[in-house]
Amino acid sequence: MDKEYVGFAALPNQLHRKSVKKGFDFTLMVAGESGLGKSTLINSLFLTNLYEDRQVPDASARTTQTLTIERRGVEIEEGGIKVKLTLVDTPGFGDSVDCSDCWLPVVRFIEEQFEQYLRDESGLNRKNIQDSRVHCCLYFISPFGRGLRPLDVAFLRAVHEKVNIIPVIGKADALLPRETQVLKQKIRDQLKEEEINIYQFPECDSDEDEEFKKQNEEMKENIPFAVVGSSEVVREGTRPVRGRRYSWGTVEVENPHHCDFLNLRRMLVQTHLQDLKEVTHDLLYEGYRARCLQSLARPGARDRASRSKLSRQSATEIPLPMLPLADTEKLIREKDEELRRMQEMLEKMQAQMQQSQAQGEQSDVL
């Protein structure tokens, strides 16, 4: 063995083994009006069937249906790597005759996950915190309109500072290639005009692989992704492909010339899953946490009457109360006690070190 070799080069292997053993968690939200192929696309993306037991309401029932939040989980294993996927669905979004404030349950749900994580993170037992925060939201846009509708804009404005948004055009096989490009540009212009932040692809380092740089640029340019989903396998010539057959031909789900399905799956799974989680924690969650601390620091914010007033305000205007007052004071006392014990322990260690040093100096003199 080389005498100059210490062994730090093996550190990535340690991290790899630890990550593989622990597995990965990822929470994905899908939102958008009914009939845009959300369920089919999710099943196509992850090669699973998350909607076996779903009952689809008829058209008359949809007009009175209110938005609900459904959470489904599945463990996917591939090549020894386990991913615990949690899918958050929003059936009923935009289906009611009156869609006023229909996005508020989604906003509350996202903030509740932040609040729960904050509680767990502030507790004494922080070893096994379950991360239920929403890491990404696929927002489906209709291919039949002329861009974003007022409801789309209102929803995206309400959540764009709370979750990574990936806009997708559902059922893109309804459009010609030229129509797809026009609609994409229209949506990009509207997002910029309305100052709506969507997920920003990180800039590649100069030493990144050239193939990865090329893929990253291609994914950036394809936003919003025009997608088609299908669980059906059809034959195109002699090849079995997943796609949809029409009288005029076959749309192949995994053909990059037909739609952006491959780019979307590559981004979500192969290249940017970890970055989506890091942005959620470092930027979106920290922003929520800062707003909570600011709301507690305001004069009178800890007064019960004031807290009651704040809780009645729209979830889009102010963060949810972080903790009940009694719980907050208890947590502060526990933290103070923990800090006091740590300070005492540190002082004892310093005293012991000084005593040992003094004894060592005395023995040297002798």
UniProtKB/Swiss-Prot annotation:
Region G3 motif: start-end pairs: 89-92
UniProt entry tagged with the keyword Transport: no
Keyword Methyltransferase: no
Coiled coil: none
Region listing for G1 motif, in residue ranges: 32-39
UniProt-annotated stretches for the region Disordered: 347-366
Localization (cell): Cytoplasm; Cytoplasm, Cytoskeleton; Cytoplasm, Cytoskeleton, Microtubule organizing center, Centrosome; Midbody
Record keywords: Cell cycle, Cell division, Cytoplasm, Cytoskeleton, GTP-binding, Nucleotide-binding, Phosphoprotein
Binding site for GTP: 32-39, 66, 92, 171-179, 229, 244
One cellular component term from this protein's GO annotations in UniProt: septin ring
Phosphothreonine found at: T250
Chief location of this protein within or outside the cell: cytoplasm
Pfam family, one: Septin
Molecular function GO labels: GTP binding; GTPase activity; identical protein binding; molecular adaptor activity
GO BP of this protein: cytoskeleton-dependent cytokinesis; meiotic metaphase chromosome alignment; protein localization; regulation of exocytosis; spindle assembly involved in female meiosis
Top-rank lineage group of the source organism: Eukaryota
Alphabetized InterPro entries for the sequence: G_SEPTIN_dom (IPR030379), P-loop_NTPase (IPR027417), Septin (IPR016491)
Low complexity compositional bias, start-end: 349-366
Chain segments carrying region G4 motif: 170-173
Modified residues annotated as Phosphoserine in this record: S206, S247, S306, S314
Role this protein plays: Filament-forming cytoskeletal GTPase. May play a role in cytokinesis (Potential).
Homology family: Belongs to the TRAFAC class TrmE-Era-EngA-EngB-Septin-like GTPase superfamily. Septin GTPase family.
Record text on subunit structure and interactions: Septins polymerize into heterooligomeric protein complexes that form filaments, and can associate with cellular membranes, actin filaments and microtubules. GTPase activity is required for filament formation. Interacts with AURKB.
Name by which UniProt lists this protein: Septin-1
Species name: Rattus norvegicus
